Amino acid sequence: MGQHDWYRNKEWSEDIELAFRARLSRSRDLYNKTQYLRIQASYLLSSSDPTIQNVGLGMMNEVLSDYPDIDDVIFNKFDALVNVGDFFYRREDFETAYINYKKAIGYDKKKTVVQDHAYHGFIKSAVFSKHEEAYPAGLKYLEDARDTNLLFLSEIYDHYLASAMLYAAIGRHETAKECASVSLRVLNEESPLHMKSGLRSIDRKR
């Protein structure tokens, strides 16, 4: 076992838990402690076994409930909420996903944590669960972020997929089609430079 593998277990048992808890108890730094706990939980949430998934959810709840909202912990709480949001989004429980993404964005506003993925998940789950009150904030974020935060193809894809969904939900169907077209182009693996040029030409049409 590598030195970092003790908090990256993909299987779970009583013996594994005892070993994990023993190592975790040796960590005195709250940032590291909550990070180890969150990372281990994220591995368990990726399991196909519902029992192991529930253990992962319990660990995420530990991060969120058992530690204070201080600078050393806030980033791991933010990531925990995003991880839980992603888990429920994959299960198509969009209401629960929305609740967790919304809480994550609340941390973002408090501590200027920047993670586009949380906003994209928030917007997509808001559309699926019909939280229309979230649409104005989602639209503002998407339009403000377009030319500043998009660096990688995965970010561009997620951004324009969320944009397409939100524009369709508010009745701006032509813009939704343009955004959907961009997300499809990303799936064809066009280069980031080419993509960014194309995105700005779309922006000018709005």
Which residues does each PLM region occupy?
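Residue signature of alpha-solenoid helical repeat architecture, marking inter-repeat boundaries
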Residues: Y31-N32, F75, V113-H117, L151-E155
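Residue at a conserved register position within TPR or TPR-like alpha-solenoid repeats
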Residues: L44-L45, L81, F88, A126-S129, ...
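TPR/TPR-like (Sel1-like) alpha-helical repeat modules
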Residues: Y98-G106, E133-A145, A168-S191
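The tetratricopeptide repeat
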Residues: Y36, V73, A80, A118-G121, ...
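Alpha-helical linker/edge segments of TPR/alpha-solenoid repeat scaffolds
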Residues: E11-E14, I123-A137, A164-T175, I202-R206
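N-terminal alpha-helical interaction modules that lie
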Residues: M1-D79, N83-R91, H173, K177-R206
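Hydrophobic, well-structured mid-protein blocks that either form specific transmembrane helices
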Residues: F88-Y135
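Short coil/turn linking the two alpha-helices of tandem helical-hairpin repeats
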Residues: S46-P50, T112, A126-E132, G171, ...
